[in-house]
């Protein structure tokens, strides 16, 4: 899977949490790393790390157990394309996606948790100027139900040209705007050393060339 083996993914999380990298100058020290790992271990549990294949059903079964033992605030399925998708007899992909997303929605409501599904677009499209178009949930392989069934949809997209280089946070759908905010775009910078996002400041012309 994209974030396996887990130890490598955990190291990335330690870097993000501490704000320090494991390489280069001013690298993270052992004490800081161990403290960060301890805190992360108290708050994050991994599902499906010892299995050859993971299905939505097995994820929810394990999440149910973890919720009983520890109490969960959220569940992240990342990424969608590494999950083994088992279709029922005569079930096409559109109906499968609709059924599975409905089951995730029901699980979230029953257990009062947030569920995030991280999914990649089929392919990146370009406009007439050969500029990459910001993908939407409709561009995810499988079904338009990724947009229709979700309460909220967010696209994280890198914008890079000769004038700017930033990460765009495109909030493309908010079902309950009266309490969860509105659609729109935010700009963030990305720190390649520690993997953290921060406030974006546009570079002036002298800094670009």
What role is predicted for each listed range?
Residues 1-24, 79-84, 149-151:
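Walker A/P-loop NTP-binding active-site region of P-loop NTPases
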Residues 1-3, 113, 117-122, 159:
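A short beta-strand-to-loop transition that corresponds to the Sensor-1 phosphate-sensing loop
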Residues 10, 33-43, 72-82:
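A glycine-rich, aromatic-flanked flexible loop/lid motif
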Residues 20, 24-27, 35, 57-75, ...:
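C-terminal regions of RecA-like/P-loop NTPase motor modules
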Residues 34-54, 122:
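Conserved P-loop NTPase mechanochemical-coupling segment
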Residues 45-47, 116, 154, 186:
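Hydrophobic/aromatic beta-strand patches that form the interior of the parallel beta-sheet core
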Residues 56, 94-98:
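Non-membrane alpha-helical structural segments and their capping/turn regions in soluble enzymes
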Residues 82, 122-123:
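Signature of the SF2 helicase/ATPase Hel1-core->accessory helical subdomain module
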């Amino acid at each position: 899977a994209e974030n396996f083996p887990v130890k490598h993914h955990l190291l990335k999380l330690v870097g993000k949490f501490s704000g320090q990298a494991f390489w280069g100058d001013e690298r993270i020290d052992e004490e800081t790393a161990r403290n960060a790992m301890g805190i992360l271990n108290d708050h994050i549990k991994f599902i499906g790390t010892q299995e050859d294949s993971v299905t939505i059903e097995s994820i929810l079964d394990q999440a149910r157990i973890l919720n009983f033992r520890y109490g969960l605030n959220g569940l992240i399925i990342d990424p969608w394309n590494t999950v083994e998708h088992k279709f029922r007899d005569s079930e096409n992909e559109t109906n499968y996606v609709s059924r599975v997303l409905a089951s995730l929605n029901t699980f979230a409501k029953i257990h009062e948790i947030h569920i995030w599904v991280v999914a990649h677009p089929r392919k990146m499209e370009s406009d007439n100027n050969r500029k990459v178009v910001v993908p939407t949930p409709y561009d995810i392989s499988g079904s338009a139900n990724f947009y229709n069934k979700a309460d909220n949809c967010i696209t994280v997209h890198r914008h890079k040209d000769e004038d700017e280089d930033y990460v765009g946070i495109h909030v493309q759908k908010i079902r309950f705007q009266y309490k969860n905010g509105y659609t729109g775009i935010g700009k963030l910078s990305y720190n390649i050393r520690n993997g953290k996002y921060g406030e974006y400041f546009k570079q002036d012309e002298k800094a670009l060339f």
